[in-house]
C-alpha cells in the first residue's frame, strides 16, 4: 500500500509543474486572484478559466 501511495504522490508532483500552471489564464495576459477581488474597468475578468478553486483570472488594465 505504501508503494501505491508513493507512486501516486510522485505522479501528482510531476503533473503540477509550475511552468504549466494556469496556462490558459496567462495566455490572455491574466493572473489568478481570489474570487472575491472586484474587477474595475479597464481591467478584464475572464472568470475561473484554469485557475485553482476559489480563484479567478483577472487582467489588470493599463490605466491610461
Curated annotation (Swiss-Prot):
Residues 1-21 form the signal peptide. SUPFAM superfamilies: Defensin-like. It is found in: Secreted. The keyword Nucleus does not apply. Expressed by the venom gland. One of its GO terms (molecular function) is potassium channel regulator activity. GO terms for biological process: envenomation resulting in occlusion of the pore of voltage-gated potassium channel in another organism. InterPro entries: Myo_ane_neurotoxin_sf, Myotoxin. Its main location: secreted. GO terms for cellular component: extracellular region. Belongs to the crotamine-myotoxin family. Cationic peptide that possesses multiple functions. It acts as a cell-penetrating peptide (CPP), and as a potent voltage-gated potassium channel (Kv) inhibitor. It exhibits antimicrobial activities, hind limb paralysis, and severe muscle necrosis by a non-enzymatic mechanism. Monomer. This is Myotoxin-2. It comes from Crotalus durissus terrificus. The lineage of its organism: Eukaryota, Metazoa, Chordata, Craniata, Vertebrata.
Amino acid at each position: 500500500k505504501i508503494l501505491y501511495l508513493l507512486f501516486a504522490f510522485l505522479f501528482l508532483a510531476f503533473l503540477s509543474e509550475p511552468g504549466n500552471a494556469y496556462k490558459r489564464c496567462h495566455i490572455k495576459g491574466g493572473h489568478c486572484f481570489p474570487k472575491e477581488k472586484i474587477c474595475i474597468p479597464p481591467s478584464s475578468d475572464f472568470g475561473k478559466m484554469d485557475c485553482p478553486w476559489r480563484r479567478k483570472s483577472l487582467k489588470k488594465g493599463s490605466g491610461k
